[in-house]
């Protein structure tokens, strides 16, 4: 008897009409007993992150057929954070994570697919696919489209963040417009996701650690042949996983998520990983909360010197041994669990067996555990009267992660950026951007344009920026995001006024305004809930159902 899930649409006399439809798309008699595997293809020419995905999808499709499966390709959406950054369009970025998850779940479950191979590139593709995979719990694998190679200008490595910072450098007189245009024309040389340890590369690493993509695959360059070979191998492994009935929730254990958190600390990953790991774990039914990040941060050092705060890009990490080399160092130090398994059915200890104990001596990207860049992880969870549920501070590259200063308050990213470019922000200020949370934005925009402008003006060490919105993986400096409760639901960030003294202290994990509980309560009585300006459409729907950022900003609690 056929035990495949797809037998619901392929077996028996009553399914003759169903089979007739499948015959039209290429099925023959013998194919109805093969596993039907969805190929969730995020190919798009919207963004360089995704423009190379179709060749990987076609390669995977061929491999599925050769390995005894029947592929069915369907499209998923993407948006480009880099293009929508600083505009109203950025409100759709985090929303797209949910759309991607919903679309993959919908297609696979509607068609009774036996497994899914998801292919993505831009930031929200990875967590979106993982949320869907956790919901469905059918054999699954993820293929990352790959990182972009660095742009070059006069021997200097460039990334997209170089262009954002150039805007601030221009307005402060540090560069001229000719230099700005040179950076613009040279920072993105081809296909692939943004090249530093930004959000896309961070999340691809998370998926590799969780065991749902192949070892070494998360750091490959998009345009290199090994990426196509990895796609071919991934499809073959997925067919085998269906035969062995290896399912995502077999791999997505609490230990596996702890491993993922350890690795993002070690590589200096994006703040967005906090939000996305919380969302994926929630969907998988795993008890991971925001406090776990701080617990693990205290033990795990940063051992990779990667942009945005460091020197190197992801292709350099790949040459130095990639995520497996980082994991081997952490495993030897007792900082990850070696008994977690991957999609091939191998434990971490098994598949890292042939990885060297020490990083190569001819590189400076990965350091050994006793010579870290920072002794503790770079993503600190801050709490206090401005964030009772927590907030996320990125403190890599910051010499003094403590600042007390007067609040400069802005009700939107646009107003803040205008003020920065007018040189209104001074050393010692605490810039506050509020009403940009999951509900208030809605959509929790990333504040890359303001933070890059601050860094470009030379204020990165002298100004703190706090928000209920998010930050790009390309952000660095003394920044605190994901403040919860957010302003739109009456969080205390909504109650502060211009000039109130705010302390950001990443050493004591503290974020607070110098106001008494009585004063905050008095202001709360006068607070008026903002009117949601989106009455129809997806942003309106999202703002009504999205959870707090401290739970991952999910929409299916």
UniProtKB/Swiss-Prot annotation:
Organismal lineage: Bacteria, Bacillati, Cyanobacteriota, Cyanophyceae, Synechococcales
Gene3D superfamilies on file: IlvD/EDD C-terminal domain-like
Modified residues (N6-carboxylysine): 124
NCBIfam families reported in the protein's UniProt record: ilvD, PRK00911.1
Organism the protein comes from: Prochlorococcus marinus (strain AS9601)
This protein's name: Dihydroxy-acid dehydratase
Active-site residues, Swiss-Prot/TrEMBL: 472 (proton acceptor)
Catalyzed reaction equations: (2R)-2,3-dihydroxy-3-methylbutanoate = 3-methyl-2-oxobutanoate + H2O; (2R,3R)-2,3-dihydroxy-3-methylpentanoate = (S)-3-methyl-2-oxopentanoate + H2O
Residues given in the record as Mg(2+) binding sites: 81, 123-124, 446
């Amino acid at each position: 008897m056929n035990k495949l899930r797809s037998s619901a649409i392929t077996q028996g006399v009553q399914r003759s009409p169903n089979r007739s439809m499948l015959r039209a798309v290429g099925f023959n008699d013998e194919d109805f007993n093969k596993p039907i595997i969805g190929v969730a293809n995020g190919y798009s020419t919207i963004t360089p992150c995704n423009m190379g995905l179709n060749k990987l999808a076609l390669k995977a499709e061929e491999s599925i057929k050769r390995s005894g499966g029947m592929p069915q390709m369907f499209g998923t959406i993407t948006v480009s954070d880099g293009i929508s950054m600083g505009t109203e369009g950025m409100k759709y970025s985090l929303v797209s994570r949910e759309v991607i998850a919903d679309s993959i779940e919908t297609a696979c479950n509607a068609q009774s697919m036996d497994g899914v191979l998801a292919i993505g590139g831009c930031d929200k593709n990875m967590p979106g696919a993982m949320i869907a995979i956790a919901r469905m719990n059918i054999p699954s694998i993820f293929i990352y489209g790959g990182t972009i190679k660095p742009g070059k200008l006069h021997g200097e490595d460039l990334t997209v963040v170089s262009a954002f910072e150039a805007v601030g450098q221009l307005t402060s007189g540090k560069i001229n417009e000719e230099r700005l245009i040179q950076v613009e024309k040279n920072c993105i040389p081809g296909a692939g996701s943004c090249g530093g340890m930004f959000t896309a590369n961070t999340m691809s690493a998370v998926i590799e650690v969780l065991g749902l993509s192949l070892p070494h695959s998360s750091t490959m360059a998009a345009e290199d042949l090994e990426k196509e070979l990895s796609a071919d191998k991934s499809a073959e492994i997925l067919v085998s996983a269906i035969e062995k009935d290896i399912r995502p929730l077999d791999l997505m254990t609490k230990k596996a998520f702890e491993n993922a958190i350890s690795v993002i600390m070690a590589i200096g990953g994006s703040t967005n990983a906090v939000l996305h790991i919380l969302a994926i774990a929630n969907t998988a039914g795993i008890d991971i909360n925001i406090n776990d990040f701080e617990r693990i941060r205290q033990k795990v050092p940063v051992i990779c010197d990667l942009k945005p705060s460091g020197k190197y890009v992801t292709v350099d990490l790949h040459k130095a041994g990639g995520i497996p080399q980082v994991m081997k160092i952490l495993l030897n130090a007792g900082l990850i669990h070696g008994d977690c398994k991957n999609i091939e059915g191998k434990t971490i200890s098994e598949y890292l067996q042939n990885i060297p104990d020490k990083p190569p001596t001819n590189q400076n990207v990965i350091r050994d555990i006793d010579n870290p860049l920072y002794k503790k992880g770079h993503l600190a969870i801050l709490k206090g009267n401005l964030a009772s549920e927590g907030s996320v501070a990125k403190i890599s590259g910051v010499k003094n992660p403590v600042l007390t200063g007067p609040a400069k308050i802005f009700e939107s990213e646009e107003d803040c950026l205008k003020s920065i470019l007018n040189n209104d922000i001074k050393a010692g200020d605490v810039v506050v951007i509020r009403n940009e949370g999951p509900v208030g934005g809605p959509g929790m925009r990333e504040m890359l344009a303001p933070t890059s402008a601050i860094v470009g003006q030379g204020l990165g060490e002298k100004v703190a920026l706090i928000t209920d919105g998010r930050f790009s993986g390309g952000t660095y400096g003394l920044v605190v995001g994901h403040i919860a409760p957010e302003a739109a639901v009456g969080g205390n960030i909504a109650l502060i006024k211009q000039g109130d003294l705010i302390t950001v202290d990443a050493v004591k994990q503290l974020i607070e305004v110098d106001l008494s509980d009585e004063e905050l309560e008095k202001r709360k009585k006068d607070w008026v809930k903002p009117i949601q300006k989106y009455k129809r459409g997806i942003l309106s729907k999202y703002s009504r159902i999205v959870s707090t950022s401290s739970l991952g900003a999910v929409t299916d609690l």
